[in-house]
């Protein structure tokens, strides 16, 4: 019975503060929309895929060659991000991007047990993301045989105007802002109730003063 009473009291508190529950999420929504559309910069990611094959001698078996390539994938990913590659890319862009900037744009990944390396570049310009990731891949493919004993480096897919917008994600930002607004409103409401020590109802007299109710004066 007490649980039911507490639930009714909780709902009454929320109902009494319904304006705050509506206004605060709306404010958060408007602020989030303004930041998303007018302040937060757009980010675009372009990707390429690269396959690296190890050189094999006449005594090598195909399976051993594949296993060796798989074990070397982590090394390849580090080489792509190394100054040896990025310095050259920076020079080919006539210093428009420093090595540090290129490294900050770059992300290199690969799936487990796969020889395929995915090179991704994220910038604020769609066409620049395409250009940079393609240039990094070409420099790596050209220089890799000189760095390690590899048979060939194949660019499986290049970026051709296929950079995708990765941020800001409008729908996610707006939903999060509404949730934040609701949570803030509820926190404010219950904080206000906890700090308000005034006796407002007969139940407050019984719970706070421990006195029985003998009678009450009705409002007219």
UniProtKB/Swiss-Prot annotation:
Q: Which residues cross the membrane?
A: 20-40, 171-191
What membrane topology term does the record carry? Multi-pass membrane protein
Superkingdom of this protein's organism? Bacteria
The record, for InterPro entries, names: Bact_polysacc_biosynth/exp, LPS_length_determ_N_term
Nucleotide-binding keyword on record: no
Write out the pathway annotation from the protein's UniProt entry. Answer: Capsule biogenesis; capsule polysaccharide biosynthesis
**Localized where?**
Cell membrane
Q: Name one GO biological process term.
A: capsule polysaccharide biosynthetic process
Keyword set for this entry? Capsule biogenesis/degradation, Cell membrane, Exopolysaccharide synthesis, Membrane, Transmembrane, Transmembrane helix
Q: Which GO terms describe its cellular component?
A: plasma membrane
| Gene Ontology MF term list | protein tyrosine kinase activity
Q: Which family does it belong to?
A: Belongs to the CpsC/CapA family.
What is the role of the protein in this entry?
Required for the biosynthesis of type 1 capsular polysaccharide.
Record protein name field: Capsular polysaccharide biosynthesis protein CapA
**In which organism is this protein found?**
Staphylococcus aureus (strain MRSA252)
